[in-house]
């Protein structure tokens, strides 16, 4: 039971200290109780200012908007409008889709998903307030289990299929009101979409006058090594959905959009909590601190080193499987490989580094191994998460303030947990995974 926390460290009621690499699901960009966040919140509380104002303008709101505009991609910042909505990312996505529907007169929404995962994606928030709209889900090239194969063929196939849908050439699917793009699909097991493919989606939507909605709920505010994940590919969206870390640890969500899409009245969203002054103050302080201290760049460099170390660990323990991510958004997907070959090789002598240690096709994900690894991490004082829709993926979301020394401590504890899981599995089954070997053609 946690009773105190500061930065990366959480202290339990028993006095034990934990390293928190879940960060409230990514909401704590600066870690627990960062001084700049606490100071900003105290300042509002001590001022006697109203804490909830719905759509009224306030100095706190103006300061948040001004700081947010400083961080936006240049192509959007100069003509951006900021719309506040309910504090959940689902409410922000609903508001963004409703805006696109009102601007285009169309109803449907297209979203991309890692469609070949074992677990189907959950429902996508859509439509305007109180309405429902059809959502068409298209596969994105994610290099693992995509129906279009791998490499360039995968990206080309996914792009051409998307173009067919957006042109209205697929029976039963009309031209959509908007296209939702998430540069790193966090809910879809930390899948990083190719930058080239993202640029092609941007060109495709622009050529057809279809608003591109960048969902930065999970990826924004420096998490991936750029302030906004779409900046890795140079994509400038028409609409951005922001939540999670944008509130500086407090509930806040906003929709940023081009001025020519400003077709709805300010009070179109009826959510009660869209004017939270404490969240706006904490959010403005967080945005400013990350910008001024270049924490996105820090996340890029340190995240790359963490990924390298984790891939080295996967080379020693093939069942660790796939290590992927960007910046400080990292996923580890344990798998059930065929261990007939030597360590670091797949069946039939597949070379080290082949996907999941398998020669012909990916090994199945092993949710049991991921859960066991999470438990062993916790026993060693390391808090990590599991994918919401894909519990076979271990998620690491440390605060952007994590130091190189702290990262080494995290990696040491994780490596120790891997060794413990491996030893137990081998003792009971003779295989590291404890699961059947990878299927062969």
Model-predicted segments: where are they?
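Conserved N-terminal phosphate-binding loop of PLP-dependent enzymes in the Aspartate aminotransferase
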Residues: 1-441
């Amino acid at each position: 039971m946690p009773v105190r926390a500061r930065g990366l460290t959480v202290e339990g009621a028993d006095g034990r200290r934990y390293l928190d690499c879940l960060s409230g699901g990514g909401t704590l960009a600066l870690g627990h109780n960062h001084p700049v966040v606490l100071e900003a919140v105290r300042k509002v509380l001590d001022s006697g200012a109203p804490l909830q104002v719905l759509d009224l303008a306030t100095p706190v709101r103006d300061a948040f908007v001004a700081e947010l505009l400083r961080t936006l991609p240049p192509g959007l910042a100069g003509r951006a409008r900021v719309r506040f909505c309910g504090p959940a990312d689902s409410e922000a996505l609903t508001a963004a889709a409703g805006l696109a529907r009102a601007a285009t007169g169309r109803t449907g929404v297209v979203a991309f998903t890692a469609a070949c995962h074992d677990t189907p994606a959950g429902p996508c928030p859509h439509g305007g307030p109180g309405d429902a709209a059809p959502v068409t889900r298209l596969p994105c090239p994610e290099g693992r289990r995509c129906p279009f194969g791998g490499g360039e063929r995968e990206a080309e196939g996914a792009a051409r299929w998307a173009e067919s849908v957006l042109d209205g050439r697929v029976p039963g699917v009309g031209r959509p009101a908007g296209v939702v793009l998430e540069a790193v699909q966090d809910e879809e097991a930390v899948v990083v979409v190719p930058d080239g493919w993202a640029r092609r989606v941007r060109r495709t939507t622009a050529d057809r006058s279809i608003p591109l909605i960048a969902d930065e709920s999970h990826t924004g505010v420096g998490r991936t090594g750029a302030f906004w994940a779409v900046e890795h590919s140079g994509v400038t969206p028409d609409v951005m959905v922001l939540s999670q870390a944008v509130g500086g640890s407090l509930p806040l969500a906003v929709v940023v959009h081009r001025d020519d899409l400003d077709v709805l009245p300010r009070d179109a969203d009826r959510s009660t909590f869209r004017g939270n002054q404490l969240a706006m103050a904490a959010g403005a302080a967080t945005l400013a601190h990350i910008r001024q201290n270049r924490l996105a760049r820090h996340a890029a460099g340190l995240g790359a080193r963490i990924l390298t170390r984790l891939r080295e660990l996967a080379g020693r323990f093939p069942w660790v499987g796939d290590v992927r991510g960007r910046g400080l958004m990292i996923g580890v997907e344990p798998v059930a490989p065929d261990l007939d070959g030597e360590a670091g090789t797949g069946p039939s002598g597949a070379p080290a580094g082949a996907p999941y240690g398998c020669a012909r096709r990916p090994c199945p994900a092993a949710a049991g191994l991921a859960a066991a690894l999470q438990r062993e991490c916790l026993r060693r004082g390391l808090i990590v998460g599991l994918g919401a829709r894909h519990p076979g993926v271990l998620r690491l979301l440390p605060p952007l303030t994590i130091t190189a020394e702290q990262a080494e401590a995290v990696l040491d504890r994780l490596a120790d947990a891997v060794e413990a899981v491996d030893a137990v599995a081998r003792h009971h089954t003779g295989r590291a995974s404890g699961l059947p070997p990878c299927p062969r053609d």
